[in-house]
């Protein structure tokens, strides 16, 4: 188990994961725990500091979220952010009230006494900075022993401190990108105030995980479903490094992959990494079950159930399998233990979560402590090619949810050819690496066109390219018009059956990234 330098107690803020990510970017290992975690459980992790996150509650409400008061007696620094600041103020005898002017968005922060007696929280910061506010309550009176260390135009207590007790608090969100030098303030808290010196490195994590896998697996075998995506590829490569041929990696070709995808996976794992990849050709089974099905939820469920069916058939061929490997990431773990429990299901998940009862395997989740960007670094350490590690996310149901309506081989071929043109042009122009996800959607809408002297009545496709940090929110990519024109021209000229290309300029929310 990795030593925990900082613990973040989560009060339900949408930004809580960003706190952990910002610290980890500075090679500071931290974990997120629910706000109601008992102090004994916190002490067991031996942290050097604690951060209280923001949250939607109000401290003066009857059912307000409260922290174990023993946290303040652990003799380690504490930092409160937004609700965390209000929680600290209330817990130490100050007052918190509903603000007459709510603050949402950018605000100008003025740091006090920066030249004469600066707080260590603001070491190397400029005296005036733009920060991100998101609150409707405010600290009205400070508790004894606390002093203001920063103000904003709407708040005389934008940041406060009790230097003697090493307790600090901010009304704004330093973890959000809009907060200038926010990362520096978080670093100052961890490095200068908490005294964190250790640097968390991916190569150390990898060595530790390989040792743990070997100890856990012993002489048993591990079954691993490989999709060709980043997470499952890194899991498979890590397991093979740890246990060699005790790994049974299974790649199911469902007929819904992009052009050349199966061949790429086979080349990387069979040829480059020498992994004994088991390839199951299940294209006919998937497509026959999807025939005539147009409802997106039904398509997802059919694909999920059929995958389990194929996985089950292959698993029965191998004796001695005791473990099942999954590419669970840290955001999945956080959500499962979050303040409010798992989020409402917007779309059915396609992963292996519904395996049959007879598969009584013990789970191995070697990536469960990592965020996506950290998984990519592990992949590079393991020798996976950058083209695979830095690829855009691809949904488990594949191209089936990029075809509006029922799925058939002719439409899949059409979509593959259009999709590869889009990706080729984005890579050639340098925009592939600058965007989060890019794909073509076959709308199954026909329109009239003219090609040469002939009238056409062919398919319309939609190009979708988005920018995002983690996929939770996204904005459409503002691609140059000449690039969009080139993509459109090539698709229409090179893919028989398409005569019109449109560009999706919707953001998430309200739209989702995928169309289905």
UniProtKB/Swiss-Prot annotation:
The active site is at 82 (nucleophile), 173, 175. ATP binds at residues 227-233. It catalyses: XMP + L-glutamine + ATP + H2O = GMP + L-glutamate + AMP + diphosphate + 2 H(+). Keywords: ATP-binding, Glutamine amidotransferase, GMP biosynthesis, Ligase, Nucleotide-binding, Purine biosynthesis. It is an enzyme of class 6 (ligase). PROSITE patterns: GATASE_TYPE_1, GMPS_ATP_PPASE. GO terms for cellular component: cytosol. The keyword Nucleotide-binding applies. InterPro entries: Class_I_gatase-like, GATASE, GMP_synth_C, GMP_synth_GATase, GMP_synthase, GMPS_ATP_PPase_dom, NAD/GMP_synthase, Rossmann-like_a/b/a_fold. The keyword Nucleotide-binding applies. Residues 200-391 form the GMPS ATP-PPase domain. Pathway: Purine metabolism; GMP biosynthesis; GMP from XMP (L-Gln route): step 1/1. It holds the Pfam family GATase. Its EC number is 6.3.5.2. Residues 5-199 form the Glutamine amidotransferase type-1 domain. Transmembrane segments: none annotated. GO terms for molecular function: ATP binding; GMP synthase activity. It comes from the Bacteria. Catalyzes the synthesis of GMP from XMP. Homodimer. This is GMP synthase [glutamine-hydrolyzing]. It comes from Sulfurimonas denitrificans (strain ATCC 33889 / DSM 1251) (Thiomicrospira denitrificans (strain ATCC 33889 / DSM 1251)). The gene is guaA.
């Amino acid at each position: 188990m990795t030593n925990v330098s900082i613990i973040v107690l989560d009060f339900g803020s949408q930004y809580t994961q960003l706190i952990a990510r910002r610290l980890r970017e500075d090679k500071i290992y931290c974990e997120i725990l629910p706000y109601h975690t008992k102090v004994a459980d916190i002490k067991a992790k031996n942290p050097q500091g604690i951060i209280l996150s923001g949250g939607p509650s109000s401290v003066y409400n009857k059912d307000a979220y409260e922290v174990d008061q023993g946290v303040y007696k652990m003799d380690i620094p504490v930092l409160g952010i937004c609700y965390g600041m209000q929680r600290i103020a209330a817990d130490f005898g100050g007052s918190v009230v509903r603000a007459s002017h709510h603050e949402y968005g950018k605000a100008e922060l003025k740091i006090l006494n920066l030249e004469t007696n600066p707080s260590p929280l603001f070491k190397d910061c400029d005296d005036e900075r733009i920060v991100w506010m998101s609150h409707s309550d405010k600290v009205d009176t400070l508790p004894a022993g606390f002093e203001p260390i920063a103000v904003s135009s709407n708040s005389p207590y934008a940041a406060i401190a009790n230097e003697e007790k090493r307790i600090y608090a901010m009304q704004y969100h330093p973890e959000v990108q809009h907060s200038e030098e926010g990362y520096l303030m978080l670093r100052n808290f961890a490095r200068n105030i908490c005294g964190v010196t250790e640097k968390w490195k991916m190569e150390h994590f990898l060595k530790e995980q390989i040792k743990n896998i070997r100890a856990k697996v012993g002489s048993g075998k591990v079954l691993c479903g490989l999709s060709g995506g980043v997470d499952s590829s890194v899991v498979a490569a890590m397991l093979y490094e740890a246990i060699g041929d005790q790994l049974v990696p299974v790649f199911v070709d469902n007929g819904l992959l992009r052009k050349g995808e199966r061949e790429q996976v086979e080349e990387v794992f069979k040829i480059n990494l020498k992994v004994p990849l088991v390839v199951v050709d299940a294209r006919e089974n998937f497509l026959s079950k999807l025939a005539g099905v147009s409802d997106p939820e039904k398509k997802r469920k059919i694909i999920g159930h059929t995958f389990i069916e194929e996985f089950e058939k292959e698993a029965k061929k191998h004796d001695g399998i005791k473990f099942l490997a999954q590419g669970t990431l840290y955001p999945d773990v956080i959500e499962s233990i979050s303040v409010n429990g798992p989020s409402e299901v917007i779309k059915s998940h396609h992963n292996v979560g519904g395996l049959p009862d007879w598969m009584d395997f013990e789970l191995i989740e070697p990536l469960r402590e990592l965020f996506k960007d950290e998984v990519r670094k592990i992949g590079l350490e393991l020798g996976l090619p950058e083209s695979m590690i830095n690829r855009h996310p691809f949904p488990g149901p594949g191209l089936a949810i990029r075809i509006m309506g029922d799925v058939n081989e002719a439409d899949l071929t059409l979509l593959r050819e259009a999709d590869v043109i889009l990706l080729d042009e984005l890579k050639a122009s340098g925009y592939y690496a600058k965007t989060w996800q890019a794909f073509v959607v076959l709308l199954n809408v026909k329109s009239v066109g003219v090609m040469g002297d002939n009238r056409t009545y062919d398919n319309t496709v939609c190009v979708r390219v988005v920018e995002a940090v983690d996929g939770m929110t996204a904005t459409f990519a503002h691609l140059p018009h000449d690039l969009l024109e080139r993509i459109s021209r090539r698709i229409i000229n090179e893919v028989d059956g398409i005569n019109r290309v449109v560009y999706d300029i919707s953001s998430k929310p309200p739209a989702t990234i995928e169309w289905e």
